């Protein structure tokens, strides 16, 4: 099946982009594997006109927004993000009315319709940097409450999180899990995602996006790392650092990320579906805050 996928990909002129949380078999056939920021940047550099995206819906839509003239397909239309769906355009409009002079910063894990109402987009890799660079001591931030709290800690700014309880179910680790792994692996370094709750972040050695997690073993000579994010990241790290050991903090599985399989990936290439289609108005409006993010990052 892998050979068939690679053959069809080449014949039909597709490039395959996969998120770090995809199953190992899909990461291994992808042309590029990365976090949402890395994938967004990669999508802008591509000369190929056809992209098969392996991730969840908001990520595929992000690729489409940045590449409106390219064909973007996904294997499973139902692969979505519960956290992104917590935030609605109505909530954003309500808070804009309450705080008319406060910039709206939206995490990339949001719907395209919500992005169209934002001032700037951020990812878990650059949220702190983006908010620091805004000329405002207060920001409206959504939809991840934990990432919003982390940004407030790191920037000293007031962060109004919307909706009230927006969070990623996959990253709701327990601080006790860190205590347990420290007993089992006393020399290990613990790295957690900023979507984790504060008690977990506070007990970790490092807090970072999946893209940042990849860089830590380059600088830290530790032999064992405990990883607090979706289980798919372990495969990526083991491939990159075969001489180190990577242990999951908990068995955190995103069922939506796992909806993509070798079978439906092959079917997507055979039928060239399902195509990501967005209204032109949404693409134009959502692109502005995304490009603003790139501007702020330099």
Curated annotation (Swiss-Prot):
<keyword id="KW-0662">Pyridine nucleotide biosynthesis</keyword>
<comment type="similarity">
    <text>Belongs to the quinolinate synthase family. Type 2 subfamily.</text>
</comment>
<feature type="binding site">
    <location>
        <position position="168"/>
    </location>
    <ligand>
        <name>[4Fe-4S] cluster</name>
    </ligand>
</feature>
<keyword id="KW-0004">4Fe-4S</keyword>
<protein>
    <recommendedName>
        <fullName>Quinolinate synthase</fullName>
        <ecNumber>2.5.1.72</ecNumber>
    </recommendedName>
</protein>
<dbReference type="GO" id="GO:0034628">
    <property type="term" value="P:'de novo' NAD biosynthetic process from L-aspartate"/>
</dbReference>
<feature type="binding site">
    <location>
        <position position="210"/>
    </location>
    <ligand>
        <name>iminosuccinate</name>
    </ligand>
</feature>
<dbReference type="InterPro" id="IPR036094">
    <property type="entry name" value="NadA_sf"/>
</dbReference>
<dbReference type="InterPro" id="IPR003473">
    <property type="entry name" value="NadA"/>
</dbReference>
<feature type="binding site">
    <location>
        <position position="36"/>
    </location>
    <ligand>
        <name>iminosuccinate</name>
    </ligand>
</feature>
<dbReference type="Pfam" id="PF02445">
    <property type="entry name" value="NadA"/>
</dbReference>
<feature type="binding site">
    <location>
        <position position="124"/>
    </location>
    <ligand>
        <name>iminosuccinate</name>
    </ligand>
</feature>
<keyword id="KW-0408">Iron</keyword>
<dbReference type="InterPro" id="IPR023066">
    <property type="entry name" value="Quinolinate_synth_type2"/>
</dbReference>
<feature type="binding site">
    <location>
        <position position="81"/>
    </location>
    <ligand>
        <name>[4Fe-4S] cluster</name>
    </ligand>
</feature>
<feature type="binding site">
    <location>
        <position position="19"/>
    </location>
    <ligand>
        <name>iminosuccinate</name>
    </ligand>
</feature>
<dbReference type="GO" id="GO:0008987">
    <property type="term" value="F:quinolinate synthetase A activity"/>
</dbReference>
<feature type="binding site">
    <location>
        <begin position="193"/>
        <end position="195"/>
    </location>
    <ligand>
        <name>iminosuccinate</name>
    </ligand>
</feature>
<keyword id="KW-0808">Transferase</keyword>
<dbReference type="GO" id="GO:0046872">
    <property type="term" value="F:metal ion binding"/>
</dbReference>
<comment type="pathway">
    <text>Cofactor biosynthesis; NAD(+) biosynthesis; quinolinate from iminoaspartate: step 1/1.</text>
</comment>
<keyword id="KW-0411">Iron-sulfur</keyword>
<comment type="function">
    <text>Catalyzes the condensation of iminoaspartate with dihydroxyacetone phosphate to form quinolinate.</text>
</comment>
<dbReference type="GO" id="GO:0051539">
    <property type="term" value="F:4 iron, 4 sulfur cluster binding"/>
</dbReference>
<feature type="binding site">
    <location>
        <begin position="107"/>
        <end position="109"/>
    </location>
    <ligand>
        <name>iminosuccinate</name>
    </ligand>
</feature>
<keyword id="KW-0963">Cytoplasm</keyword>
<keyword id="KW-0479">Metal-binding</keyword>
<dbReference type="GO" id="GO:0005829">
    <property type="term" value="C:cytosol"/>
</dbReference>
<feature type="binding site">
    <location>
        <position position="254"/>
    </location>
    <ligand>
        <name>[4Fe-4S] cluster</name>
    </ligand>
</feature>
């Amino acid at each position: 099946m892998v050979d068939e996928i690679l053959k069809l990909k080449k014949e039909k002129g597709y490039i395959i982009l996969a998120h770090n949380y995809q199953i190992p078999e899909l990461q291994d056939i992808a042309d590029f594997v990365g976090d949402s920021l890395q994938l967004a940047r990669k999508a802008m550099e591509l000369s190929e006109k056809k992209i098969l995206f392996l991730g969840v819906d908001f990520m595929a839509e992000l690729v489409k927004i940045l590449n409106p003239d390219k064909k973007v397909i996904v294997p499973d239309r139902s692969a979505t993000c519960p956290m992104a769906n917590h935030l609605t355009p109505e909530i954003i409009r309500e808070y804009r009315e309450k705080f008319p002079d406060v910039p709206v910063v939206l995490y990339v894990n949001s719907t395209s319709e919500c992005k169209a109402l934002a001032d700037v987009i951020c990812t878990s890799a650059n949220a702190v940097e983006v908010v620091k660079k805004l000329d405002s001591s207060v920001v409206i931030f959504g939809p991840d409450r934990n990432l919003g709290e982390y940004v407030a800690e790191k920037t000293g700014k007031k962060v109004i999180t919307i909706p009230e309880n927006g969070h990623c179910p996959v990253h709701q680790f327990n601080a006790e899990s860190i205590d347990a792994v420290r007993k089992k692996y006393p020399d290990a370094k613990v790295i957690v995602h900023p979507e984790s709750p504060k008690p977990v972040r506070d007990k970790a050695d490092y807090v970072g996006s999946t893209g940042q997690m990849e860089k830590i073993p380059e600088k830290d000579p530790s032999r064992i790392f405990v990883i607090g994010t979706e289980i798919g990241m372990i495969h990526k790290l083991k491939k990159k650092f075969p001489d180190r050991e990577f242990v999951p903090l908990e068995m955190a599985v995103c069922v939506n990320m796992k909806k993509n399989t070798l079978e439906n990936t092959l079917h997507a290439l055979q039928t060239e579906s399902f195509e990501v289609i967005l209204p032109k108005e949404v693409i134009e409006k959502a692109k502005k805050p995304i490009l603003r993010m790139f501007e702020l990052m330099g």
